[in-house]
Amino acid sequence: MKNFVFISPNFPESYWKFCAELKNNGLRVLGIGDCPYDQLKQELRDNLHEYYKVDSLENYNEVFRAVAFFTYKYGKIDWLESNNEYWLMRDAKLRTEFHITSGFMESDMDRIKLKSAMKAYYAKAGIPTARYHLVEGYEDALEFAHKVGYPVVVKPDNGVGASNTYKLKCDDDLRFFIDHMDDNIYIIEEFVNGHVETFDAIIDADGKPIFESGNVTPHSLMDVVNNNEDSIYYIVKDLAPDIREAGIKTVKAFGVKSRFVHLEFFVLNADQEGLGKKNDVIGLEVNMRPSGGFTPDMYNFAYETDVYKIWADMIAFNKCTLNMDRPRHFCAFVGRRDSREYELDHNAVLERYGYCMKLECRLPAALATAMGDQVYMCNFDTEDDLQNYFRNLIRKKGE
């Protein structure tokens, strides 16, 4: 029996489904986390062979000892994953220490975690990226900003999501940022006038996709977080050919095997000198894990499938055992803010869209910053219905 160590299997909450499908496929699933065992969801407990509680997942020595214990008790560890951006570097260090060769090792991490290091691999794939500079201080950042022109975007070179990401519009903005910059290494990039589309896939051990999807984010996540805007995005009914082509090239250039990926691209809204023509695809960043939040469930809603099983099939059999010839839909996400009054209140939304509502729920404050306080997910068969849904749900009272 193969041993699979799942780091932090309780977060996100839906990750128990990965564990369940691994168990169904005959793997011994061993969990490591800092949540007390009796506070784990029953569904997770039912699908873990054993759980090792540490005081803190931030304490590497504790987690190392947990993996060592499982190795002593059950033999060689075949897989170790968290499927979580925050722990990717930790995962790779543990794989390296315990010679677990089924995933990225410590030596691989710069190219998949550092935004500056990703640029060379996008170039290898033949995909352009925004010009950039690693910030040392005000003078060098100012020189770069004047070279490419404002606005510019600054963000941690090793960051997650839109955290500490800012659009700077003038020298004064840049000075303020430099004066208040934390200890992170920051990358400054030319602003790209585009919207984000993704290539999301489960890649097998041969570097081939066994599941493909993508999502479109009409509004910048940076603006959603920094301006407290409504959050909207959707799973595509059919993946655009140019996004698929860019995704496949990126997978090959980065040497991706045996994992879920969420690869982000800009699609230019207009011609941009030095980057390309309107609708050209530009590399943004790679994420070597599933797209966050509710997205895995939204794939399932959109394609009437089960990505938790497809991923576990990849782990166990290096192939998909499901019939993928199923109806396909758009699946649209809207996250609304409690601080705003909307034309359609909560009950009106449920009344109008109950027929196609797949999920609605409240989010805790920790997640609401990026996703909204109240979220709704609906399936649609046409883009017109999808866009009307977005307009209706984010229209403010009196507009």
Stretches found by the model and what they are:
Residues 1-105, 320, 384-398:
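ATP-binding N-terminal substructure of ATP-dependent carboxylate-amine bond-forming enzymes
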Residues 102-114:
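Short, acidic/small-residue loops that bind anionic groups at enzyme active sites
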Residues 111-193, 205-208, 233-245, 391-397:
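Active-site nucleotide/adenylate-binding loops and adjacent lid/helix of ATP-dependent enzymes
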Residues 180-185, 190-233, 241-281, 287-296, ...:
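Phosphate-binding core of ATP-grasp and ATP-grasp-like enzymes
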Residues 278-282, 288-337:
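C-terminal structural cap/anchor segments
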Residues 312-399:
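Peripheral (often C-terminal) accessory segments that flank ATP-dependent C-N-forming ligase machineries
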